[in-house]
């Protein structure tokens, strides 16, 4: 058994799936493999991920048994009956999603819900109400929202209700107010209870519009998670990126709001440099999913992996023997796959510390809570039921 670490960093490469899992066919995603298909279409430059052992999980070449990974690496199969951000992150912290939240991709949101939303949106007429790409719907409808004081509402293959608002014409505060009201309305009936209401601010004019990083997610409030246990044990919980929104601020001590993946990695690097103790740093890198997976931009996805690998190298340099790093993912989103939605896939688990003596390949593991259990055991807490306990294998 390895020693206890003073700090644990968990980085979620949002949507970085690694191929088939036990439920892939039932989700209609047979053949999806996000990382492999990106690698087949883009010449990845990833010396740090290779050093840690990514090629044991997915590679263009036959597995090389002579590879000596510097981290423990394994594949995880999710337990939850879902393939979305909320289900993935919640499972990491101890909550299994057995029944997926409703989605509205076939017919849009029902008239009764639309009427309730329009009342809450100061009488603005809702336009859109369809399954759409966020960037595409702005091209079609943003001018109407601005000129007529209407409001774009749309959904995605995930369980979401997304609301657009121009930062100048509508104003961020109004957009956030509408999104909070929509969360309350959706939560009032089980048939409307989407996993997330998302405020999608944008800027621009004359047909040229860009979404900004002032996005906010309003999720259902989870029951108590491992984060609560950490907080009660006086371990500082630090949320970087979307993490605070995903857990509705519950049991989060310090928040670094969503930014680019590079900027979120920079936050992790700066935290590591402080050499403080008793910290759990939970990082989400959303651009893999939002900018490249959903948009089916395989080259962009590859470039983002390269950028992540470069920042990963900087992080590895500043981590000490007293730090533990976990890299994983919440679901897949294969940019070569038909459609624009998430893909059900196996997910990576990479566990690294300079203190490890002889890291090795792990067997396939059941439950994203496996990563959470590493955190729990490190800080002397009770394990969670949504994953396996591999702590005693880390040496």
Swiss-Prot record:
Cofactor note text: Binds 2 manganese ions.
Pfam families per UniProt: Metalloenzyme
Amino-acid positions noted as binding Mn(2+) 2 in the UniProt annotation, renumbered to this chain: 289, 294, 342
Enzymatic class: isomerase
Superkingdom, natural source: Bacteria
GO molecular function list: magnesium ion binding; manganese ion binding; phosphopentomutase activity
Keyword tags: Cytoplasm, Isomerase, Manganese, Metal-binding
ATP-binding in keyword set: no
Enzyme nomenclature, EC number: 5.4.2.7
Gene Ontology CC terms: cytosol
Reaction catalyzed: 2-deoxy-alpha-D-ribose 1-phosphate = 2-deoxy-D-ribose 5-phosphate; alpha-D-ribose 1-phosphate = D-ribose 5-phosphate
Cofactor: Mn(2+)
Record localization: Cytoplasm
A biological process from GO: 5-phosphoribose 1-diphosphate biosynthetic process
Family: Belongs to the phosphopentomutase family.
NCBIfam families per record: deoB (TIGR01696), PRK05362.1 (NF003766)
Function: Isomerase that catalyzes the conversion of deoxy-ribose 1-phosphate (dRib-1-P) and ribose 1-phosphate (Rib-1-P) to deoxy-ribose 5-phosphate (dRib-5-P) and ribose 5-phosphate (Rib-5-P), respectively.
Protein name: Phosphopentomutase
């Amino acid at each position: 058994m390895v020693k206890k670490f003073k700090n644990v960093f968990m980085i979620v490469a949002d949507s970085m799936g690694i191929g088939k899992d036990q439920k892939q066919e039932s989700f209609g995603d047979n053949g999806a493999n996000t990382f492999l298909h990106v690698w087949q279409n883009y010449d990845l430059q990833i010396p740090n991920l290779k050093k840690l052992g990514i090629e044991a999980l997915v590679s263009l070449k036959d597995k090389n048994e002579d590879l000596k990974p510097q981290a423990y690496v394994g594949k995880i199969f999710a337990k939850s009956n879902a393939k979305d951000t909320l289900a993935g992150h919640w499972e990491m912290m101890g909550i299994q999603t057995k029944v997926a939240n409703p989605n509205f991709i076939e017919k849009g949101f029902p008239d009764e819900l639309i009427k309730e939303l329009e009342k809450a949106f100061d009488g603005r007429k809702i336009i859109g109400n369809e399954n759409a790409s966020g960037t595409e719907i702005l091209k079609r409808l943003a001018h109407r929202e601005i000129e007529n004081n209407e409001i774009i509402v749309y959904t995605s293959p995930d369980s979401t209700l997304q609301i657009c608002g121009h930062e100048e014409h509508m104003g961020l505060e109004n957009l956030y107010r509408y999104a909070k009201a929509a969360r309350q309305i959706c939560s009032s009936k089980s048939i409307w209870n989407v996993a997330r209401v998302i405020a999608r601010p944008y800027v621009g004019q004359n047909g040229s519009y860009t979404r900004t990083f002032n996005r906010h997610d309003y999720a259902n409030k989870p029951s108590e998670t491992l984060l609560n246990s950490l907080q009660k044990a006086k371990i500082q919980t630090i949320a970087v990126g979307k993490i605070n929104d995903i857990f509705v601020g519950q049991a989060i001590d310090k928040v670094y709001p969503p930014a680019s993946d590079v900027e979120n990695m920079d936050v992790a690097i700066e935290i590591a440099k402080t050499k403080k103790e008793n910290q759990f740093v939970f990082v989400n890198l959303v651009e893999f999913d939002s900018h490249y997976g959903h948009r089916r931009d395989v080259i962009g996805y590859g470039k983002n992996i390269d950028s992540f690998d470069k920042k990963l190298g900087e992080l590895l340099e500043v981590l000490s023997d007293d730090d533990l790093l976990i890299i994983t993912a919440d679901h897949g989103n294969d940019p070569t796959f038909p459609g624009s939605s998430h893909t059900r896939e196996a997910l990576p688990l990479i566990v690294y510390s300079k203190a490890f003596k002889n890291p090795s390949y792990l067997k396939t593991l059941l439950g994203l809570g496996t990563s959470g259990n590493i955190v729990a055991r490190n800080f002397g807490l009770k394990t969670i039921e949504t994953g396996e306990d591999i702590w005693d294998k880390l040496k």
